[in-house]
Swiss-Prot record:
The name this protein goes by in its record: Minor capsid protein L2
Disulfide bridge positions per record: C19-C25
Coarse class of the protein's main subcellular location: virion
GO molecular function (one): structural molecule activity
Record's comment on post-translational modification: Highly phosphorylated.
Family: Belongs to the papillomaviridae L2 protein family.
UniProt subcellular location: Virion; Host nucleus; Host early endosome; Host Golgi apparatus
Stated role: Minor protein of the capsid that localizes along the inner surface of the virion, within the central cavities beneath the L1 pentamers. Plays a role in capsid stabilization through interaction with the major capsid protein L1. Once the virion enters the host cell, L2 escorts the genomic DNA into the nucleus by promoting escape from the endosomal compartments and traffic through the host Golgi network.
Keyword set includes Ubl conjugation: no
Stretch list, region Disordered: 238-260
Subunit details: Interacts with major capsid protein L1. Interacts with E2; this interaction inhibits E2 transcriptional activity but not the DNA replication function E2. Interacts with host GADD45GIP1. Interacts with host HSPA8; this interaction is required for L2 nuclear translocation. Interacts with host importins KPNB2 and KPNB3. Forms a complex with importin alpha2-beta1 heterodimers via interaction with the importin alpha2 adapter. Interacts with host DYNLT1; this interaction is essential for virus intracellular transport during entry.
Source organism (scientific name): Human papillomavirus type 5b
Pfam families from the UniProt entry: Late_protein_L2 (PF00513)
């Protein structure tokens, strides 16, 4: 009888992770993971009273802890596998402790029969107040000669003393003007005056107005002097036009990349020229070489290398990119016709040798976009705060004054010669040809209103039938007119549905032939 193979149980950690949520864990798994076994409890509660931290238990080194293995009743032990070392301090340690104890006074020894009561003596407490401060007075001698602002004392015999007190000198008044300036790199004050009437200084506007800004007729004739405009310093700055661009990164002639050893992208003898019309050539040219997924993070602005297996033939999305192994970064230039050209140099891997080398021709893929025109010069305005740009218009100054006599009114006679009836409007409104429009004039829908035969002659004009219809009931005593019916029978067709079929009248249906059955 074959013995059954023992299947090893899974690890305790993995079993605990899977069965803890379900509550089906074995007791031994829970005790081992949560450290609640008998040995764990002995270590937990026994470590409160016994410390075995320096013995190196369960370290696997066999050194016996910090003191080594010591037999009972002997001195310090020796570590296994090592020689004892004597540790000597480099400096002599100084004794740290209290001050030396003074000897007991033996002059007045205490007799054994003396009283043990010690009399109290008065002692002066510690003086906590500050001590006396020494004061030093500096005495300055009086100058011998007369000094400024010194009182003069005059003494005379037989009269009262007169004391002349000099007035107290008034110190000079100091006026301090401060101006705070905060530096703002985006704001710059231009201290400039444009040719205008007035004055300017820094950022403070000073406006000078006068009453000679208008035009006076009939007054004194003054001499008119032609003034010339004072050009500012910005007038002499001539901005040269931007030269037309020929490539995306213009390089000097001595650093030209495409001219070394006669190599050029437009050389038809060395490079195959292929014009691409697909717009993916500008953004994602790799989609023209092989089918791939979109990666919005990757920008195809570098050289793309495609690793294809030559044993397996894969049809590319575009036949012009067949067997392309490398597609370099784009280059921007201009054509002789003035168009922008995006070029990429590619390498084909058409032939592979036995050593693994791949041989292929070089292809110039390009697409012409548009032309690059020279920018028109734009007049730039000054940035910052400067005076002279604001135009202030005053009504009384800019008006025209006429010198005339107000007492005489030459128009009074001509006004009285005409009557007020000439101001009345004599136009006659005629509404005979008008029409009543119901609805909105902006509606573009056309509705056909059927015209019924009636004895009343009237015209209806309806422009929009989406409004409201108001019907007013009327009663007339008109005789009802009965029109004679024609001789042709009337065919009635019921059109209950809007399909393409119809129902015939029962009189028009084909009658069934009656037959008698024997």
């Amino acid at each position: 009888m074959a013995r059954a193979k023992r299947v090893k149980r899974d690890s305790v950690t993995h079993i605990y992770q899977t069965c803890k949520q379900a509550g089906t864990c074995p007791p031994d798994v829970i005790n081992k993971v949560e450290q609640t076994t008998v040995a764990d409890n002995i270590l937990k509660y026994g470590s409160a009273g016994v410390f075995f931290g320096g013995l190196g238990i369960s370290t696997g080194r066999g050194t016996g802890g910090a003191t080594g293995y010591v037999p009972l009743g002997e001195g310090p032990g020796v570590r296994v596998g090592g020689t004892p070392t004597v540790v000597r301090p480099s400096l002599v340690p100084e004794t740290v402790g209290p001050v030396d104890i003074l000897p007991i006074d033996t002059v007045n020894p205490v007799e054994p029969t003396a009283s043990s009561v010690v009399p109290l003596t008065e002692s002066t407490g510690a003086d906590l107040l500050p001590g006396e401060v020494e004061t030093i007075a500096e005495i300055h001698p009086v100058p011998e000669g007369p000094s400024v602002d010194t009182p003069v004392v005059t003494t005379s015999t037989g009269s009262s003393a007169v004391l002349e007190v000099a007035p107290e000198p008034i110190p000079p008044t100091r006026v301090r003007v401060s101006r705070t300036h905060y530096h703002n790199p985006s704001f710059q004050i231009i201290t400039e005056s444009t040719p205008a009437q007035g004055e300017s200084s820094l950022a403070d506007h000073v406006l000078v107005t006068s009453g000679s800004g208008g035009q006076q007729i009939g007054g004194d004739i003054t001499d008119i002097i032609e003034l010339e405009e004072i050009p500012s310093r910005y007038t002499f700055e001539i901005e040269e036009p931007t030269p037309p661009r020929r490539s995306s990164t213009p390089l000097p002639r001595n650093q030209s990349v495409g001219r070394r050893r006669g190599f050029s992208l437009t050389n038809r003898r060395l490079v195959q020229q292929v014009q691409v019309d697909n717009p993916l050539f500008l953004t994602q040219p790799s989609k023209l070489v092989r089918f791939a997924f979109d990666n919005p993070v990757f920008e195809e602005e570098v050289t793309n290398i495609f690793e294809n297996d030559l044993d397996v033939f894969e049809e590319p999305p575009d036949r012009d990119f067949l067997d392309v192994r490398e597609l370099r970064r784009p280059q921007y230039s201009t054509t002789p016709a003035g168009y922008v050209r995006v070029s990429r140099l590619g390498t084909r891997a058409t032939i592979r040798t036995r050593s693994g080398a791949q041989i292929g021709s070089q292809v110039h893929f390009y697409r012409d976009l548009s032309s690059i025109n020279t920018e028109d010069p734009i007049e730039l305005q000054l940035l910052g705060q400067h005076s002279g740009d604001a135009t202030i218009v005053q009504g009384p100054v800019e008006s025209t004054f006429i010198d005339m006599d107000i007492s005489e009114n030459p128009l009074s006679e001509s006004i009285e010669a005409y009557s007020h009836d000439l101001l009345l409007d004599e136009a006659v409104e005629d509404f005979s040809g008008s029409q009543l429009v119901i609805g909105n004039r902006r509606s573009t829908n056309s509705y056909t209103v059927p015209r019924f035969e009636t004895t009343r002659n009237g015209s209806y004009y309806t422009q929009d039938t989406k409004g409201y219809y108001v019907a007013y009931p009327e009663s007339r005593n008109n005789a009802e007119i009965i029109y004679p019916t024609p001789d042709i029978p009337v065919v009635i067709i019921h059109t209950h549905d809007n399909t393409g079929d119809f129902y015939l009248h029962p009189s028009l249906r084909r009658r069934k032939r009656k037959r008698k059955y024997l």
